[in-house]
Amino acid sequence: MGKSQYVTGIKKMPINERPREKLLNYGPESLSNPELLAIILSTGTKEMSAIDLATHVLSYSEEGLRHLKNCEIEELQQIKGVGIAKASQILAAVELGKRISLTSRVNHYRIKSPDDVSNLLMEEMRYLKKEYFNIALLNTKHEVIAIENISIGSLNASIVHPREVFVVAIKRSSSAIILVHNHPSGDPSPSGEDIRITKRLVEAGKLLGIEVLDHIIIGDNVYYSLKEKSMM
């Protein structure tokens, strides 16, 4: 029922105004945000076409498109017309966009200071609602090879084990690494556990010949460098 009504709604539109046809004829850059999201959603509901539903999703928050960047699946499902399937489609598209964006910025990005780490990862990590512990893998020139996630959730020594960190670094032939994690509270001040984990990883790195250059904690548009504060 929903699909047939969606098709009828689309068929009422002039051919050159239909999202898919616009994309094929003029390229994706010619589409509005609701039109792009409508293609991802594919179908609407009994009451709304895919474009109407996409507009509804984007207007759910004052932040609009930006809100989707760190939205949880449960939050999306609270929007009328969005079930688990459509929520999954949205999150998959958002995550793919994040990865493409990060990959394009990471390639040969050289780290010379904590500011460089912040410039690279602040926007990716400042709005995250859970703690993400990532490592930046560097070559001999301190250029970023990749950013790898090690754990998600509250940081503690049982989760962030040296083995999990350095097996990734060794596989990617990293000469050095930088630890990066976020504080969802927005306050980047390190906890006692943050400091203990850092020191443990620094010692493990010395044994393996892979230097831990810094541990950057990301807050809300502010960061804390344990190296700068002589805490490692």
Curated annotation (Swiss-Prot):
GO biological process, one term: proteolysis
Residues holding Zn(2+): 181, 183, 194
Alphabetized CDD domains for the sequence: MPN_DUF2466
Motif (JAMM motif): 181-194
GO molecular function, one term: metal ion binding
Key words, A-Z: Hydrolase, Metal-binding, Metalloprotease, Protease, Zinc
Domain MPN: 110-232
Entries under PROSITE patterns matching the protein: MPN, UPF0758
Family statement drawn from the similarity comment of this UniProt entry: Belongs to the UPF0758 family.
Annotated PANTHER family: DNA REPAIR PROTEIN RADC, UPF0758 PROTEIN YEES-RELATED
NCBIfam families: PRK00024.1, radc
Name listed for the protein in its UniProt record: UPF0758 protein Amet_2289
